[in-house]
Regions:
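Short helices/loops that flank or line small-molecule/ion binding pockets
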Residues: 110-121, 190, 208-213, 295-309
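Glycine-centered hinge/linker elements that transmit conformational signals in sensory
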Residues: 211, 256-291, 334-338
């Protein structure tokens, strides 16, 4: 009973956090500031003047960027280059620019970025699209120089940036990587239990039914298996299965109004409560330590005992199975389908985005840098190397030509 209440409490908090923060026309600027379009024109003149004078343009890039120095993947044993690669590549192509990169940990990243912006210490905000009070509306930049956006899978990170018109979505960031959710599953466990693999027709009820059947003693090996895994170490991930359930059922738990303060949240309706009940049932099919991020250490290996993982870790899990020679054992399936006559899947696509700070020193130069980050093929390879999917159609098509098993799932969702 204690475990059940703990899971429900965590799900409640996670759902609110997820809907409030990270996930996928001009907003009103802060008092006394110019419009983004005017600023872009002014900054272009500033950049030209700086170039003519021989002075270097400084772009301060701040945000969550993983590791600064090289690391070694403990499973694949491959070297993963640090984010210094960004500086080396960009400055080599743009000798008039000095990049100053500052990585921060994911812990309390939004608060830290808000503080840095208030101190006028950032130009490009890494993963800052959700912090709408400190970043630019990118509409005027895209209207002036946005042809490259057609080459991206996700053109923008949208947010409700104008609190006086909260029903309107505004582009506040450009995704550099994209992370679609899918169900990664262990074919051997499905085979041991005599069950069909997940496919593009599965509903959330199909997932739960299969998860329940595969939680218990494996009829072939005699070992304990679990039907499902939720990455409970990340609080928003605990809620994403529930959000996916709401999405598939077309259940509205948030009613957006014109003004932010008039927006209503309702988790007590019969339809909303079904989401809590459903995910609580899913939680019963997870390893006991999932709320602390434990229990999936062997997923992707020969000794795995988890049948399904609803995850965005497509690349890192694939790299793991590839290094162990187990790519044939694991499969990738779509997120559960949308119901009530709608087409598609209940997919959550996250990103690692870049945004322009409202008080950036040279906004035109920032836009050029972000455009380069989104389209450069060397950067795309670096993202893949680090276990992420580049948000770049050319790169994805090039990588999918190598027969990556989840390519179709990613493209279609």
């Amino acid at each position: 009973m204690k475990r059940k209440m703990k899971a429900v409490a965590a799900l409640s908090l996670a759902a609110v956090m997820l809907l409030a923060g990270c996930g996928s026309s001009k907003g009103t600027q802060d008092g006394g500031s110019t419009t983004a379009a005017d600023t872009a024109e002014q900054q272009e003149g500033t950049e030209t003047a700086a170039s003519d004078s021989g002075e270097k343009i400084v772009i301060r890039v701040v945000g969550p960027m993983e590791n600064e120095n090289d690391t070694t993947n403990p499973v694949t044993k491959q070297t993963v280059r640090g984010y210094y690669v960004i500086k080396e590549l960009y400055e080599a192509e743009h000798p008039n620019v000095e990049l100053q990169l500052t990585g921060i940990p994911w812990d309390s990243w939004q608060a830290k970025l808000t503080t840095v912006a208030a101190a006028n210490q950032v130009d490009v905000v890494v993963h800052g699209a959700s912090i709408v009070d400190i970043v630019e509306d990118l509409t005027p930049y895209a209207e002036k120089d946005g042809d490259f956006l057609d080459g991206l899978l996700l053109k923008y990170s949208y947010r409700r940036a104008d609190k006086s018109n909260y029903t309107k979505l505004v582009p506040t960031g450009i995704p550099i990587t994209a992370a679609a959710t899918s169900i990664m599953y262990d074919k051997k466990i499905f085979d041991d239990y005599g069950l069909d693999y997940p496919d593009e027709t599965w509903t959330w009820e199909d997932v739960l039914d299969a998860a329940k059947k595969m939680t218990g003693t494996d009829p072939v090996t005699g070992e304990q298996t679990y039907g499902y895994y939720i990455d409970g170490a990340s609080s928003d991930w605990v809620g994403r299965s529930m959000i996916g359930y709401y999405f598939s059922k077309d259940t509205k738990v948030i009613e957006y109004a014109d003004k932010q303060m008039d927006t209503k949240v309702n988790y007590t309706s019969p339809e909303a409560l079904k989401g809590f009940e459903f995910v609580n049932e899913l939680a019963k099919t997870c390893p006991k330590g999932f709320l602390e991020g434990r229990g999936a250490e062997n997923f992707g290996t020969e000794n795995n005992n988890i049948a399904m993982w609803y995850s965005q870790n497509l690349v890192s899990n694939y790299q793991k199975t590839e290094s162990l020679g187990l790519t044939d054992r694991y499969g990738y399936a779509y997120s559960p389908v949308l119901e009530n006559g709608r087409e598609g899947w209940a997919n959550f696509t996250g990103d690692w985005n870049m945004a322009i700070a409202k008080n950036a020193q040279n906004k035109e130069a920032c836009w050029e840098f972000i455009k380069w980050m989104a389209t450069n093929q060397d950067i795309a390879d670096w993202c893949w190397e680090g276990g992420k999917i580049p948000n770049n159609k050319e790169a994805i098509e090039r990588l999918s030509a190598e027969n990556i098993p989840f390519a179709d799932v990613f493209f279609n969702t």
